[in-house]
C-alpha cells in the first residue's frame, strides 16, 4: 500500500544523529513520513525508510548495528532499523517495531543491551534493544516531555509536574527514589560531572551527593 500519514504540515523537530557506519559518517534525520541516512560529505541519501508519522521530536539513538527512533505524531511507533542497507530499506531492514509505550516527545535512551523510553502519558518501558522484547512497562506519572538520562547505573526521569523518578537500569523494574520539586518542568536533565542540573518553570537546581 502507499505509505504516509497524509500530514499537511511537513515539519519535524528531531535533532539528527551523526554516526559512523563501516568507515563512513551518516547523518540520521527523521522527518514527516520518512527517515533519511545522509552521507555527511555530500548530503546524498544512503538509505531511507518510510512510516506513518509527522512532527517527529525524539532524537534517534544508535547501537548494535541499528538506529532506534520514534515516528512522532499521530500514533508513535519505535522502530529499529539496520544500518547496512542502500536505497529504500522500508521492507528489508526494519528489525522490530513497538507501539505500546512509544513516545511522541521524549527521546529514547540506550544503555548497553537495553532501550529505555517514557511515553508522553507516563508509561516507562524497558526493551531488549536487539529484539524489541519487552522486559517491563510501568506507569511513572501523568505526563512527560523531558527525555530520560542515564548515570551511575540509574535511569532518571522528570515529569511535567516536576516529579523526578529514579529507576535502576535493569531488566527488572525497580524504583529507587521519587522526588517532587513542586514546580512544572518540561526540560531534560543536564549532567555536569557527578551533578544534575534541573530546570523548572521558575528555578534552576544544582543537585549533587553530599
Task: Describe these PLM feature segments.
Residues 34-40:
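Membrane-embedded hairpin module used as a gating/binding unit in multi-pass transport
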Residues 76, 162-163, 169, 183-210:
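Blade-level signature of beta-propeller repeat domains, shared across WD40, Kelch, NHL, RCC1
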Residues 76-78, 98-169:
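Loop/turn-rich, solvent-exposed surfaces of beta-rich toroidal or solenoidal domains
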Residues 30-32, 72-74, 83, 120, ...:
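Short loop/turn segments immediately following the C-termini of beta-strands
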Residues 1-24, 30, 48-63, 70-76, ...:
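Extracytoplasmic beta-rich repeat domains
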Residues 80-89, 129-130, 166-172, 208-210:
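Short loop/turn segments immediately following beta-strands, especially the blade-tip
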Amino acid at each position: 500500500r502507499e505509505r504516509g500519514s497524509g500530514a499537511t504540515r511537513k515539519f519535524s523537530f528531531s535533532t539528527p544523529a551523526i554516526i559512523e557506519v563501516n568507515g563512513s559518517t551518516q547523518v540520521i534525520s527523521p522527518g514527516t513520513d520518512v527517515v533519511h541516512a545522509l552521507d555527511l560529505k555530500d548530503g546524498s541519501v544512503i538509505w531511507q525508510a518510510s512510516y506513518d508519522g509527522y512532527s517527529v521530536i525524539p532524537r534517534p539513538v544508535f547501537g548494535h548495528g541499528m538506529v532506534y527512533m520514534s515516528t512522532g505524531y499521530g500514533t508513535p511507533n519505535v522502530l529499529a532499523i539496520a544500518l547496512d542497507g542502500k536505497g529504500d530499506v522500508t521492507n528489508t531492514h526494519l528489525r522490530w517495531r513497538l507501539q505500546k509505550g512509544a513516545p511522541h516527545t521524549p527521546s529514547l535512551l540506550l544503555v548497553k543491551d537495553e532501550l529505555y523510553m517514557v511515553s508522553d502519558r507516563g508509561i516507562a518501558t524497558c526493551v531488549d534493544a536487539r529484539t524489541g522484547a519487552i522486559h517491563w512497562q510501568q506507569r511513572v506519572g501523568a505526563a512527560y516531555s523531558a527525555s530520560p538520562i542515564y548515570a551511575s547505573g540509574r535511569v532518571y526521569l522528570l515529569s511535567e509536574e516536576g516529579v523526578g523518578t529514579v529507576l535502576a537500569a535493569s531488566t527488572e523494574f525497580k524504583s529507587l527514589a521519587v522526588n517532587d520539586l513542586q514546580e512544572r518542568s518540561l526540560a531534560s536533565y543536564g549532567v555536569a560531572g557527578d551533578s544534575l542540573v534541573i530546570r523548572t518553570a521558575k528555578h534552576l537546581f544544582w543537585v549533587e551527593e553530599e
